[in-house]
Amino acid sequence: MANDPRKLLVTCALPYANGSIHLGHMLEHIQADIWVRYQRLRGNTVNFICADDAHGTPIMLKAQQMGMTPEAMIEMVSEEHQRDFAGFDISFDNYHSTHSDENRELASHIYLQLKKNGFISSRTISQLFDPEKEMFLPDRFVKGTCPKCKSEDQYGDNCDACGETYSPTELINPKSAVSGATPVMKDSEHFFFDLPQFESMLKEWTRSGSLQSETANKMQEWFEGGLQQWDISRDAPYFGFEIPGEKDKFFYVWLDAPIGYMGSFKNLCDKRGDLDFNEYWNKDSKTELYHFIGKDIVYFHSLFWPAMLDGSGFRKPTNVFVHGYVTVNGAKMSKSKGTFVKASTYLNHLDPECLRYYYAAKLNNRIDDLDLNLEDFTQRVNADVVNKIVNLASRNAGFITKRFDGKLSAHFAEPELYAEFAGAADRIAELFEAREFGRAIREITALADKANQYVDEKAPWVVAKQEGQDQALQDICTVGINLFRVLMTYLKPVMPALAERTEAFLNQELTWEGVATPLTDHAVTPFKALFNRIDPKQVEAMIEASKAEAAAEKAAADAAKPKSAETELSKDPLAAEIEFDDFAKVDLRIAKILSCEAVEKSDKLLKFELDIGGETRQVFSGIKSAYQPEDLIGKYTVVVANLKPRKMKFGMSEGMILAAGPGGSDLWLLEPHQGAQAGMRVM
């Protein structure tokens, strides 16, 4: 490691401002925070920033559903996000929003520089338009089948299954995610970033050797497939920044979202006054820039983002660190099973340090998915943190407090053992630097096993009962506490709250350099419980709470959905199909109503005398609730003339009058247009 402190700017991907933080998000933020805390522990200068990704049609539509402005909604979500991250001890130096003055200024500047340098063009394109909502459909509001791998139910910009990016018009069988309607094509002028002009630069950047091999290999696939111009504009209505000099045209959210890294840092510079924005972002910057992201957004960060920066005169990232997804109990996070756990729900039931430790224990520097096995989570935290590490302090601290007034021995009895523990610092440092946190944890727990073996062999609880062995007891416990101190120094980036409580107990700050020398002739404070084991019932309660939250949210969402319009067919579906010959048997005729009277002792029936063209018929019809008899005399209607006469209580009915409606007062007699004559056949 260089002697001079490094200057690093570190970012996490920007959470979208239309939903809550969940344990999938937390993998990235914990991974980045551990790395950042390690860098700070080694004396490097780190600026750790993030922001909410606050633009796009999804936010605009959700705000409408909630009955508030997009600005009010993203402010509310930002407060929730920051509260959750703080709950997990994510040590951001600044948390901002892409909907900010800084981001508007920088997005406009970068666009205009790209345009000036010949990297922006425009052309008329045909794009999908929702005929019901009368709006162009952004990528994420079209769903269909991926044109490459044929996976169904994929969004209109990229496929979650194979990672391919494409235009919404390339989707197979597209549907509007807003209304469910089949979109139609409509012309619109759009603006494009000429990504192919940067292919040579991007290939060189890929071959630099700093990118993860999986990322470099994926980029090579994209190069072989041919880079395409990138559509960076969207049509109104849209919540975002208008493109300078254009009417009703907005920057696509993926243009201004990564610029949000710059906007958040600019905001931090303005707050602090001792930071130089240009020192970190100029093309010749000597500082280091790192992005932690998920594997679903590699395309944007490894192709578009470095090309945009290069084309507008800014520096490119030093590296992009990509991680996989979180699964729970070997399966995709599920709301119905309660394994889709919000950060806030977790914090209501469990210590955030437990998840920080478990994620660290399973993380490596590859793009592997991480499985949060809840049974293993409970067992590993209890076995490693409680039984091996914290217990090491509790087994020794009581004797130091009670027998030696809290004073460690002036003599360190096991220099060779301590040298082994201190000597692991370089190896563990290399692993933290390389983001091989799981391997670092294994090194630390292996040392913890050795420390506990030492205490078991020395048995201070036995020595304490032996007369004249006070010095031996103090020496043993001093060694045990010092080994605990070394372990907690190594764990400080992973478990900062536990490290802080340890520092209070030791009455000394834990520093990486301090590991080199044991703590002797030093007073510690009375020992208090440093960490609580996980009760499986806490995990069960968290899962049940997640199920309940998901059910309540689904019920609320269903209630908020516009009810599909009830139609007459939905209320009274069609009867089974019949053959034409069956229908041809029915003889429908125009009939003139000669007389009409109410049938006594009947609530429904009217008695009609009908002229069907030279023949008079008596017909009873159940439309009494809808008509006054005298209003019908002289009208024309339609009758089934060849229906077999039916004897009724009040007389013989020689046909059937046709009427429409659900019943009661909602009945309407069928009447032909003027010109129809009694006896005419209805064709």
Curated annotation (Swiss-Prot):
Gene assigned in the entry: metG
| Ranges spanned by the short sequence motif 'KMSKS' region, renumbered to the chain | 332-336
Q: Which GO terms describe its biological process?
A: methionyl-tRNA aminoacylation
Annotated keywords: Aminoacyl-tRNA synthetase, ATP-binding, Cytoplasm, Ligase, Metal-binding, Nucleotide-binding, Protein biosynthesis, RNA-binding, tRNA-binding, Zinc
Cross-referenced Pfam families = Anticodon_3, tRNA-synt_1g, tRNA_bind
- Which family, according to the similarity comment? Belongs to the class-I aminoacyl-tRNA synthetase family. MetG type 1 subfamily.
| Species of the source | Vibrio cholerae serotype O1 (strain ATCC 39315 / El Tor Inaba N16961)
Identify this protein by name. Methionine--tRNA ligase
Cofactor(s) in the UniProt record: Zn(2+)
Per UniProt, subcellular location reads as: Cytoplasm
**Positions annotated to bind Zn(2+):** C146, C149, C159, C162
* Principal location class: cytoplasm
